[in-house]
């Protein structure tokens, strides 16, 4: 369309150019006629060539005055004005105008008019073409819009195809599922139809059988039905009779149960009263035993009245021996139940383990006269020790008898409980048999369950009471052990005359382990009691740890919280006491004068403990005022000697010190001091273990 619009425009421009050139040539050369003829001939030729155009131009010329264009009007006026001006200017010059000029002028005017008409026509055409161009542009814009829409639709075709494919797949799946459902329903319909056919067939058979009344099976069935009804009536009668009997028996059984419960409560109350009486008697016996133990343990202590250093040292050793025996008596009573002789046997190797040490030639040259004196002096010590041992044996016998009585009481209680349980079980079995037969087991279970609940409550209450009683006994034993650990030392008898009697027999001797302990208290442990705390700790650190055999015969018998497989305490105690007697006999034969001499004592300490033991003895002998400095940590039986005048004063002061029991006196402080050296040997630990065992049970 653009090319078509462009081609007529170019033709019109060419025509306008041709007319313009001819018009200018006419105005430029008005005088030349030749040119005018040429100009006149040119439009004529144009008219000849384009006759159609002339007709159209004529039409336009005729139409032009009707609708003159705005552009054409000023051109016409201008041409006319210019023509008039030229004519006015030329009129005086050319007065003699010819006809040729008039013709030329008229031809020019005609030409101008024609050109003006053509211009107006062209302007009209141009306006029409502009309108046409605008309309074509609008059409092009619309067509472009339509094309864009079409292109967009073409682009969307792929998406539409994809969506369409998805819809097709979904529809196919739905179709498949619906087909499967249809098949399943068809199968069900077939099954139901087959079942219906079978049921119809069976129904027809049953109808035929029911219509046939003259069958032999029907008579048999009627007879069986009558017999079953008769049996049912008989069973109902029996059930009624049994239910009545059951009610009567349950009533009688409840009465018996109430009577037995009353008896059980009465027996339980009596048992409580008897248990209280037994406990009261047991506490009384314990208190009496404690009083006897306290009197027997501290009735035969030695007083410290010694005029010489040697006698004072011998008295110290004997007092240490007595304190060891007192500890053994008190602590042996506490832990007799848990003691096992298999763990710590008394072998002759332990007794004679230190004999080879005393066979050296330096210790064999002893003073025989001092041996005689010491032997006769220590003979008097054995009498109170023997009495104490006999009392200890009697106390142990009483303790064992009490244990046997308690065991018998426990066995009786258990037997009574077992009998009651057996009786209840037998009664329950008797009741359950008719209940299971009649099918009314639940009616009789209610009182039985109540009885079981009461029985369980009674058992729980008995267990609680037993546990509380056991805990109370353990607390009392703890209090007793504490009271026995810290007793008050009474005055000891005067053994000076016995120790230093003139009748002494000369005899060589050997030290054993037990005699060494009885002299010095566990390898001379009590030597540290006359020194301050630091020196005692140093000597304790130098000493090697005690072997298990030492626990069998010393100041303490340990308990290891094992009550099973106990041996006979009487045979064990008798063997132990025989050993102590033998050791004391050896002690009476030994010479006390060896230990009283400072040089020989220092040698013995060096052999046993090295240089630390001798340094402690030298510090004791050099420091006479150490008793006053370390009064709280010193054994009251061991004091340092001075000159004779001061010794008598110290003896009087010590007698007053023994009499004042509550004045900064603690006889068991040295035991607590050395408790860290032997942590396994503690009675309190065993009692705590027993408390934990009872709580766990």
UniProtKB/Swiss-Prot annotation:
Polar residues composition bias: residue spans: 527-547
Coiled-coil zones: 103-297, 389-485
Stretches with biased composition (Acidic residues): 686-697
Keyword Transit peptide recorded: no
Disease: Leber congenital amaurosis 5: A severe dystrophy of the retina, typically becoming evident in the first years of life. Visual function is usually poor and often accompanied by nystagmus, sluggish or near-absent pupillary responses, photophobia, high hyperopia and keratoconus.
Record PANTHER family: C21ORF13-RELATED (PTHR16650), LEBERCILIN (PTHR16650:SF10)
Name of the protein: Lebercilin
Organism in which the protein naturally occurs: Homo sapiens (Human)
This protein's encoding gene: LCA5
């Amino acid at each position: 369309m653009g090319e078509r619009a462009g081609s007529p425009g170019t033709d019109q421009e060419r025509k306008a150019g041709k007319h313009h050139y001819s018009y200018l040539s006419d105005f430029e050369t008005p005088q030349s006629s030749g040119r005018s003829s040429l100009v006149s001939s040119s439009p004529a030729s144009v008219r000849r060539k384009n006759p159609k155009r002339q007709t159209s131009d004529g039409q336009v010329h005729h139409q032009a005055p009707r609708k003159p264009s705005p552009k054409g009007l000023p051109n016409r006026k201008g041409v006319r004005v210019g023509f008039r001006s030229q004519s006015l200017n030329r009129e005086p010059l050319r007065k003699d105008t010819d006809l040729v000029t008039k013709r030329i002028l008229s031809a020019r005017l005609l030409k101008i008019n024609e050109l003006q008409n053509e211009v107006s026509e062209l302007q009209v055409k141009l306006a029409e073409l502009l309108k046409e161009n605008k309309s074509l542009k609008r059409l092009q814009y619309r067509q472009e819009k339509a094309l864009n829409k079409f292109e967009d639709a073409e682009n969307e075709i792929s998406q539409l195809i994809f969506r369409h494919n998805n819809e097709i797949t979904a529809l196919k799946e739905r179709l498949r599922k619906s087909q499967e459902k249809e098949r399943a329903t068809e199968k069900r319909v077939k099954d139901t139809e087959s079942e219906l056919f079978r049921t119809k067939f069976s129904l027809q058979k049953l109808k035929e059988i029911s219509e046939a009344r003259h069958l032999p099976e029907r008579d048999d069935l009627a007879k069986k039905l009558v017999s079953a009804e008769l049996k049912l009536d008989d069973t109902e009668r029996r059930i009624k009779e049994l239910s009545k009997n059951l009610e009567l028996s349950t009533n009688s059984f409840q009465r018996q149960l109430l009577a037995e419960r009353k008896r059980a409560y009465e027996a339980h109350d009596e048992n409580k009263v008897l248990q209280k009486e037994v406990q009261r008697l047991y506490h009384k016996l314990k208190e009496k035993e404690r009083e006897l133990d306290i009197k027997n343990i501290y009735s035969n202590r030695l007083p410290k009245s010694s005029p010489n250093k040697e006698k004072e040292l011998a008295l110290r050793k004997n007092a240490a021996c007595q304190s060891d025996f007192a500890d053994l008596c008190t602590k042996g009573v506490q832990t007799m139940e848990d003691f096992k002789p298999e763990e710590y046997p008394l072998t002759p190797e332990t007794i004679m383990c230190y004999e080879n040490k005393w066979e050296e030639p330096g210790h064999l040259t002893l003073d025989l006269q001092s041996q005689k004196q010491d032997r006769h002096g220590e003979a008097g010590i054995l009498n109170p020790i023997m009495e104490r041992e006999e009392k200890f044996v009697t106390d142990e016998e009483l303790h064992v008898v009490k244990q046997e009585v308690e065991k018998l009481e426990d066995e009786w209680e258990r037997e009574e409980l077992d009998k009651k349980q057996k009786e209840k079980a037998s009664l329950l079995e008797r009741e359950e048999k008719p209940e299971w037969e009649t099918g009314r087991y639940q009616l009789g279970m209610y009182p039985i369950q109540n009885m079981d609940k009461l029985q369980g409550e009674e058992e729980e209450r008995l267990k609680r009471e037993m546990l509380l009683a056991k805990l109370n006994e353990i607390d009392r034993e703890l209090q007793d052990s504490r009271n026995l650990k810290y007793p008050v030392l009474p005055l000891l008898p005067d053994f000076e005359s016995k120790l230093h009697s003139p009748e002494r027999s000369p005899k060589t001797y050997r030290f054993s382990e037990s005699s060494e302990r009885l002299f010095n208290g566990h390898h001379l442990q009590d030597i540290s009691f006359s020194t301050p705390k630091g020196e005692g700790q140093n000597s304790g650190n130098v000493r090697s740890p005690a072997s298990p055999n030492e626990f069998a015969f010393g100041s303490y018998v340990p308990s290891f919280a094992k009550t099973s497989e106990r041996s006979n305490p009487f045979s064990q105690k008798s063997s132990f006491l025989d050993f102590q007697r033998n050791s004391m006999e050896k002690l009476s034969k030994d010479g006390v004068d060896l230990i009283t001499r400072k040089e020989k004592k220092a040698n013995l300490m060096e052999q046993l403990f090295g240089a630390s033991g001798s340094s402690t003895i030298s510090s004791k002998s050099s420091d006479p005022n150490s008793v006053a400095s370390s009064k709280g940590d010193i054994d009251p039986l061991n004091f340092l000697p001075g000159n004779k005048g001061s010794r008598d004063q110290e003896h009087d002061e010590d007698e007053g010190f023994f009499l004042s029991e509550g004045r900064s006196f603690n006889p068991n402080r040295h035991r607590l001091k050395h408790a860290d050296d032997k942590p396994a040997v503690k009675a309190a630990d065993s009692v705590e273990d027993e408390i934990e065992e009872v709580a766990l049970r």
